[in-house]
């Protein structure tokens, strides 16, 4: 298979990934609006899998074409980041069995593909040989691990943002089962001072008989059921975000260390306060504070979720923002169009 055929395959898979993500995003939003139609969510999951396979095929074709791991320019790295987000999303959804995850993650993945496909110039999309500075075995160790960490941290932060939206009317929701050693995703009890007591206790206090009592009990039971569902949803989102960020943090730590070792080999210095290095350290501290607060201070709920939302912005600044706003050692091959 020659280079032109590989390029044609990449264009086809690029379009397929974009179309699949558009369909998946629409289906997940429809599934959130019409919860009684489970087929919508199943179709959305299938479309997400098609998108993941399309991106996998595109990256594989680019790897064969260029004979190196496809993270040497912005186009390749965006698709690899999209692959990471989709893979983490599908795994998290299967693990937590929570349909709401895709409502937040898939629009982000769609935005990545749309930006790389519709905004970048043909020169920035084209594959080619590595520049001398990137011809190192550290390329895959550093860059791929960093982007993997971005994917996990982004999805974890998006789940935290989902938690903030779900609980925005509750001042201080009480959660259990989200900290270390509390049982993972086991169904936890939820108490809220504003919640309606269970139907059984209301029945004993109100007695039986009388249409007014029956109507009141039915309404109160429905309210309690809605509150319980929302509580279980908040519990799952808080739990899931904690574990995803716990997965991404070691990856970004390893990626930063690998980058420092590579920098010492290439330029004789472990750390040069390059803009991307500086922001990666800021991002590391944000998520280190998140995990420290949860593990040692027992933070749960809105406070760590707010910190994770700040981390989501910091990840984007680290990955993309500094390439637009500053020049440094990490700028070549990303926005230079080489």
UniProtKB/Swiss-Prot annotation:
User: Which NCBIfam families would you find in this protein's record?
Assistant: cytochr_II_ccsB
InterPro entries associated with the record? Cyt_c_assembly, Cyt_c_biogenesis_CcsA, Cyt_c_biogenesis_CcsA/CcmC
What interactions and quaternary structure are annotated?
A: May interact with ccs1.
Instruction: Give a yes or no for keyword Iron-sulfur in this entry.
Output: no
- Protein task: Required during biogenesis of c-type cytochromes (cytochrome c6 and cytochrome f) at the step of heme attachment.
One cellular component (GO) term of this entry: plasma membrane
Q: What is an example of a GO molecular function annotated in this UniProt entry?
A: heme binding
Parts of the chain that traverse the membrane: 11-31, 39-59, 76-96, 100-120, 145-165, 244-264, 278-295, 305-325
Superkingdom to which the source organism belongs? Bacteria
Source organism of this protein record = Gloeobacter violaceus (strain ATCC 29082 / PCC 7421)
| Keyword Cell inner membrane among UniProt keywords | yes
What membrane topology does the annotation report for this chain?
Answer: Multi-pass membrane protein
Query: What protein family is recorded?
Result: Belongs to the CcmF/CycK/Ccl1/NrfE/CcsA family.
What's the protein name?
Cytochrome c biogenesis protein CcsA
Question: Which UniProt key words apply to this protein?
Answer: Cell inner membrane, Cell membrane, Cytochrome c-type biogenesis, Membrane, Transmembrane, Transmembrane helix
Cellular compartments annotated: Cell inner membrane
């Amino acid at each position: 298979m020659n280079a032109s055929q590989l390029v044609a395959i990449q264009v086809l898979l690029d379009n397929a990934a974009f179309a699949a993500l558009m369909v998946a995003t629409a289906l997940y939003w429809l599934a959130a609006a019409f919860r009684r139609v489970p087929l919508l969510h199943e179709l959305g999951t299938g479309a997400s899998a098609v998108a993941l396979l399309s991106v996998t095929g595109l990256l594989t074709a680019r790897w064969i074409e260029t004979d190196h791991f496809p993270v040497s320019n912005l186009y390749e790295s965006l698709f690899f980041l999209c692959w990471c987000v989709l893979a983490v999303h599908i795994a998290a959804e299967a693990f937590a069995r929570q349909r709401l995850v895709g409502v937040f993650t898939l629009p982000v993945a769609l935005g990545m593909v749309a930006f790389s496909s519709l905004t970048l110039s043909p020169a920035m999309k084209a594959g080619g040989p590595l520049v001398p500075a990137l011809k190192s075995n550290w390329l895959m160790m550093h860059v791929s691990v960093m982007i993997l960490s971005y994917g996990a941290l982004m999805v974890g932060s998006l789940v935290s943002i989902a938690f903030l939206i779900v609980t925005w009317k509750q001042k201080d929701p009480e959660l259990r089962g989200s900290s270390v050693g509390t049982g993972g995703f086991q169904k936890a009890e939820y108490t809220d001072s504003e919640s309606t007591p269970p139907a059984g206790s209301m029945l004993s206090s109100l007695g039986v008989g009388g249409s007014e009592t029956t109507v009141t009990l039915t309404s109160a039971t429905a309210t309690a059921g809605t509150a319980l569902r929302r509580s279980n949803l908040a519990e799952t989102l808080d739990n899931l975000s904690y574990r995803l960020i716990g997965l991404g943090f070691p990856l970004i730590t390893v990626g930063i260390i690998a980058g420092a070792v590579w920098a010492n080999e290439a330029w004789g210095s472990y750390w040069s306060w390059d803009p991307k290095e500086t922001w990666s350290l800021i991002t590391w501290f944000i998520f280190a504070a998140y995990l420290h607060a949860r593990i040692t201070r027992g933070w749960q709920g809105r406070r760590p979720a707010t910190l994770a939302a700040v981390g989501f912005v910091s990840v984007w600044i680290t990955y993309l923002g500094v390439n637009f706003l500053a020049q440094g050692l990490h700028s070549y091959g990303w926005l230079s169009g080489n």
